[in-house]
């Protein structure tokens, strides 16, 4: 199974903490970067300053329109969420869709877990937060196009989880690359999810900036 070690420099985390102290959600910083944070849980993320934000409010409004089973309960459990893209044309609907995007979409979501979810959570359930990745990996279910690029355990001060990157899609359609980092808090009460995705070609063209975003993701904890 392909594996790619994910490393983070402590100096980057210290820089983020220093820049973000005193703000719950921040979108300011150096000439080249902006910072998103959720201070109550010590969650930080650095992105290019020029990227456009899809706000928590717009995401909540979009999610409230879902009629899927359990959608209302999942939405109610969200503590905070925000999304970004270099394109101002990306909407909240695009964020929640699994359809291909020609522009990178970065989505950060923090939500509480129910008692039932806490008892059932596992590394495989963390992998399956967006698509049934664990079954694609073990072959119990298949998809026409699937390549696992990375699948590594992640340890943060505030929790632990798994980072995965993979390419998937229908046989005759454009494939997309999805990178996800899913962290379970130390008390097993909260899930921190960072998802980055776009078409395979788009991801290859933007991999340097997306790699930096993924490396900046920090869950410091309460």
What role is predicted for each listed range?
Residues 51-53, 134, 188-222:
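Surface-exposed amphipathic alpha-helical segments
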Residues 29-31:
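Bacterial signal peptide processing site
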Residues 33-46, 133-137, 207:
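Short aromatic-glycine motifs in intrinsically disordered, low-complexity regions
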Residues 40-63:
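Proline-anchored loop/turn motifs at beta-strand termini and strand-loop-strand connectors
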Residues 58-182, 192:
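Conserved polar/disulfide-associated segments of primarily extracytoplasmic proteins
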Residues 42, 123-127, 200, 204-208:
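Soluble non-cytosolic domains of exported or imported proteins
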Residues 2-16:
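Bacterial N-terminal signal peptides that target proteins for export
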């Amino acid at each position: 199974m392909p594996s790619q070690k994910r490393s983070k420099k402590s100096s980057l985390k210290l820089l983020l903490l220093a820049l973000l102290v005193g703000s719950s959600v921040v979108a300011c910083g150096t000439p080249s970067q902006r910072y998103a944070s959720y201070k109550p849980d010590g969650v930080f993320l650095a992105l290019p300053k020029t990227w456009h934000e899809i706000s928590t409010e717009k995401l909540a409004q979009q999610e409230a329109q879902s009629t899927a089973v359990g959608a209302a309960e999942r939405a109610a459990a969200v503590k905070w969420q925000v999304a970004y893209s270099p394109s101002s044309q990306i909407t909240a609907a695009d964020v929640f869709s699994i359809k291909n995007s020609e522009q990178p979409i970065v989505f950060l979501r923090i939500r509480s877990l129910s008692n039932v979810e806490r008892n059932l959570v596992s590394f495989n359930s963390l992998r399956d937060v967006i698509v049934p990745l664990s079954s694609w990996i073990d072959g119990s279910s298949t998809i026409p196009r699937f390549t696992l690029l990375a699948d590594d355990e992640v340890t943060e001060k505030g929790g632990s989880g798994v980072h995965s990157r993979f390419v998937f899609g229908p046989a005759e359609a454009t494939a997309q690359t999805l990178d996800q980092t899913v962290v379970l808090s130390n008390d097993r009460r909260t899930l921190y999810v960072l998802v980055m995705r776009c078409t395979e070609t788009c991801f290859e063209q933007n991999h340097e900036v997306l790699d930096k975003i993924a490396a900046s993701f920090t869950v410091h904890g309460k």
